[in-house]
Each structure stands twice: as structure tokens, then as C-alpha cells.
Amino acid sequence: MGTTKHSKLLILGSGPAGYTAAVYAARANLQPVLITGMEKGGQLTTTTEVENWPGDPNDLTGPLLMERMHEHATKFETEIIFDHINKVDLQNRPFRLNGDNGEYTCDALIIATGASARYLGLPSEEAFKGRGVSACATCDGFFYRNQKVAVIGGGNTAVEEALYLSNIASEVHLIHRRDGFRAEKILIKRLMDKVENGNIILHTNRTLEEVTGDQMGVTGVRLRDTQNSDNIESLDVAGLFVAIGHSPNTAIFEGQLELENGYIKVQSGIHGNATQTSIPGVFAAGDVMDHIYRQAITSAGTGCMAALDAERYLDGLADAK
């Protein structure tokens, strides 16, 4: 494993929360070390247009925004390490973390590990992952040019994926278990325009029963009517994109931090220290602690808060010496 690297402040995650925390911590001369995780840049790297980032309304993409954040963090001399942490010890001081490429210790820790795409859990879905089943249209949509595809989900992500794929695929079948969609109104408006004048076909009150295929990959899906369970229909599609939400990346913290439905619990913030977890000196920011708002801007905001909380914590340690 080699030598252990120690830092005053370690940040886990390279999405908006992690990079923002790094900028604020670096400007406070905390000399932060940021561990990127396996998905450098987080979920925004799979997002095409970002229209709600204040001050940049035109032609901003997720990858571009994350590239700028990376540059901003490095400008203030954040040390960025590409590694994935697979084990932590938060019961002793300093905190100890083991990665694929090294071992790290720190006096304060900011967890900004984000969330990962959730799947339905069907055996047939698992069987065709990477062979026609995907959770990222911007990653894999290119492979389905002029082919029929299906998207399952009813929120912002599902509608965005369907709209994106409608510019690539010949037909996009959007499947949702309820009658109405939960997406933002502007996205619903665009969706309905594509339904009326384009190539998106809605299948509401339907659940995915099975993914069908052969040795080459996905060939179709079977849907069940939620209002008449005897009604099963089949669609011929070459790809299925699952967009049913995300699960927080907190598995390595189970049994060490207080969690709620997998999300890290933090303080209310009425008296400050809003991002502190159940262990003093460990802070959380972004989607790993927020299952409600889940926006790039709110993730960045909590990253800022975590850095300020960590700075105050470290100042307290220094004063106590």
C-alpha cells in the first residue's frame, strides 16, 4: 500500500459539493486533499444542458461545468487524487481511510460522495446491463442512433433522458408507473411537444415486467398495466434506459455514521455547524445528505457550508492545543 498520506482536511467526492468545499477550504489555507472517487465529476458529467446554473444561462453542459470547478479548485492548490475509498475508520483519531491506491489520514473529513443510479432489480435487467440496459443516455445514447429505445421513470431525469434520446433514436417509449409525471413544468412542456409533434410515445400506468433479448443484447421489453394486471404488452426496442432515481453512496459508512434511509444525517444548522454528522469532525455535503432538493446549486451550497464548518472545527482543535 505504501506510505500513509496525512492532511488536515480530506474531501471525498468530485461533484459540485466536493469541488466547492475544496475551493473554500483552500482559500482558508487548510491545504485540502480531494479524493475524486470512481466517477470523477459526479453525476453532472452525464448531463447535457445545464440551464439553471445562475450567471451562465447559455450553452453550459455538465462536463464543462465540472471542468471549470476542477480548474477552480486546482487554482487554489487543492491536491486532487484519483482514487476510490473502500474502507474507513472514523472511530479513532486521526480518521483513517483506505483506497485502491493508498492510505490516508485526516483531522477533519468532508463526505461528498454523492449518489448513484438506482435500478429496478429485475433479473432480466441485471442480465442485460451493458448490453442494452443503461442508466445514462448521454453516455450510451449514441449507440442507438435511428433505433427504438425505451426510458423508464417519471421525474426530471427520465424526461430529460427521453428528450435527449429523441434527437438520436427513431422512437423513444417513455414508461411510467403512474398517470402523471413529476418533472418540472418546463420539461413537461417540452415532453408534450415531442409527444404531439415528435417521436416520443408515452406508456403511463405501466411497470416493467421483463427485459427480453438474445446473445447480442436487448430486443424488447414487456410491460404490465397497473390498472389491469392481466394486460401485458410487448415493445420492440434495442435499448432500455432506467431513470428511476438514485441511491446515496454511503455503504462504507454504515455502522459508523448515523444514516436515515441510506442518507447521512446532519445537524439542523439552527446554531451553525449544519453539515456535521454524528461524529464531530466529519461533515457531509451534497446528494449524500440531501434526498429532497438534489440540485447542482444546492450541492455546491452545502459544500461551502461543510468547508466553513470544517474550518471552525479545525480552528477549535488548534486552540485546544
UniProtKB/Swiss-Prot annotation:
InterPro entries: FAD/NAD-bd_sf, FAD/NAD-binding_dom, Ferredoxin-NADP_redctase_2, Pyr_nucl-diS_OxRdtase_2_AS, Thioredox_Rdtase. It comes from the Bacteria. GO terms for biological process: cell redox homeostasis; removal of superoxide radicals. Its cofactor is FAD. PROSITE patterns: PYRIDINE_REDOX_2. One of its GO terms (molecular function) is flavin adenine dinucleotide binding. FAD binds at residues 36-43, 287-296. GO terms for cellular component: cytosol; thioredoxin-disulfide reductase complex. It catalyses: [thioredoxin]-dithiol + NADP(+) = [thioredoxin]-disulfide + NADPH + H(+). Keywords: Cytoplasm, Disulfide bond, FAD, Flavoprotein, NADP, Oxidoreductase, Redox-active center. NCBIfam families: PRK10262.1, TRX_reduct. Homodimer. Belongs to the class-II pyridine nucleotide-disulfide oxidoreductase family. This is Thioredoxin reductase. It comes from Escherichia coli (strain K12).
